[in-house]
Amino acid sequence: MTDAAQNVIVLKDAYDRWAESKGDSADHWTAIFADKIKFGSLAQGSYGAAYLTAYQTRDQLAQYFAGLKRDWEMLEYVAEHYVAQGDRVVMLGHCSWRNRSTRKVVATPKADSWRFADGRAIEFYEYYDTAQLRDAAV
């Protein structure tokens, strides 16, 4: 099996667990992150979601997952397609979340870009509708 195919298998399992737990558990994510990771989110800390920003280590990512869990209720997370080439994988899907304070819902297409080395994720960047995020957070 190629590294690209193995990386897709790892991600499919992680996305399945994420959806099944409704965002309640991040252990499956932290298990695949390298100690040092270049991690980014399109919102870059805007819209009252300071945790949707850049991180450099797996330990720092606890802030990201704690913020999501505190502020948002996952309604749906569907990873539909995976495109893999070499050390990179892109996941295309959609998700919806309800803001716990405003009760407003974000339903957005989702694209995640991953890069792997030695079986661990060393880069991640997520893309989603930041206008909906802004509108739901206020």
Give names to the regions the model predicted:
Residues M1-A14, A50-Q60, E80, A107-T108:
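Charged, low-complexity, helix/coiled-coil-prone segments
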Residues M1-A5, A66-V138:
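A beta-strand edge to alpha-helix "cap/lid" segment located at domain peripheries
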Residues M1-D35, V138:
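Short, low-complexity N-terminal intrinsically disordered segments enriched in polar/charged residues
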Residues V10-L11, G45, L61, V89-M91, ...:
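Hydrophobic aliphatic residue packing
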Residues W18, A50, R103:
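Generic anion/oxyanion-binding catalytic loop in active/binding sites
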Residues A31-D87:
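A solvent-exposed, acidic/Ser-Thr-rich amphipathic alpha-helical stretch
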